[in-house]
Regions:
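A conserved short beta-strand
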Residues: 107-118
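Short beta-strand/loop motif that positions the catalytic acidic residue
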Residues: 132-135, 139
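Conserved serine/cysteine hydrolase catalytic core
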Residues: 118-128
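Active-site signature of alpha/beta-hydrolase-fold catalytic machinery across serine-
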Residues: 20, 101-102
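Serine-hydrolase catalytic machinery in alpha/beta-hydrolase-like enzymes
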Residues: 1-84
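C-terminal catalytic histidine-bearing segment of alpha/beta-hydrolase fold enzymes
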Residues: 55, 144-189
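Gly/Ala-rich beta-loop-alpha elbow adjacent to hydrolase catalytic centers
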Residues: 90-95, 99
Length: 189
């Protein structure tokens, strides 16, 4: 049975940013995995980068519409090919925040947030999908304390956290924990 991994890039990046990671995960997992890298809908102040919503200053009022728009894109994608229940959402930084806000109220197989943060008024569904939260202890862009704000809002039996010695990045040593998570949520679904 086919599965899908949807990638959400961070603020100022493009959809190409996470594609090497997605290809690496797809090559290493022993099941068919389609990789889709979505581009944020808005231009970053310094093109060609993109943004899910304005961040400097933070436009928190735009978040609900951004989340709704992303959820509609995910629903459209899953009308063909792998279902929502066979889809994992993986986001980095602002993309991680969007993955959490959008994915935790959808019937996804799982959500992976890398160096993400909780949106101010985010309240995940009680029955949210399994979540993997990864964050660097030396992250100078999104402080590692953001991980606490995420885990406080999620059910502990549905959320796994990993902190690592690095900054605002996804280091190579995090690929294996991602693979383990993907295998668990996709083979069980």
């Amino acid at each position: 049975m086919n599965s899908r991994l949807v990638l959400l890039h961070g603020w100022g990046a493009t959809s190409d940013d996470l594609e090497p990671l997605g290809r690496s995960l797809a090559a290493a997992i022993d099941l068919p995995l389609e990789v889709v890298a979505l581009a944020a809908p808005h231009l970053h102040p310094q093109p060609p980068g993109r943004q899910w919503y304005g961040l400097f200053p933070a436009d928190w009022d735009a978040v609900p519409a951004a989340v709704e728009a992303l959820q509609e894109r995910l629903k459209a994608i899953t009308r063909h090919g792998p279902s929502m229940e066979r889809t994992v959402l993986l986001g980095f930084s602002q993309g991680g925040a969007m993955a959490l806000s959008s994915g935790c109220s959808l019937p996804l197989a799982g959500v992976i947030s890398c160096s993400g943060y909780p949106h101010p008024n985010w309240q995940p569904a009680e029955q949210h999908p399994p979540v993997l939260v990864m964050h660097g202890r030396q992250d100078a862009i999104v402080p590692s304390t953001a991980m606490d704000g995420i885990t406080e809002r999620l059910r502990s039996d549905r959320c796994e956290t990993i902190s690592f010695d690095n900054g605002h990045t996804i280091p190579e040593e995090m690929v294996q924990p991602m693979l383990t998570f993907l295998k668990r949520v996709l083979k069980g679904s």
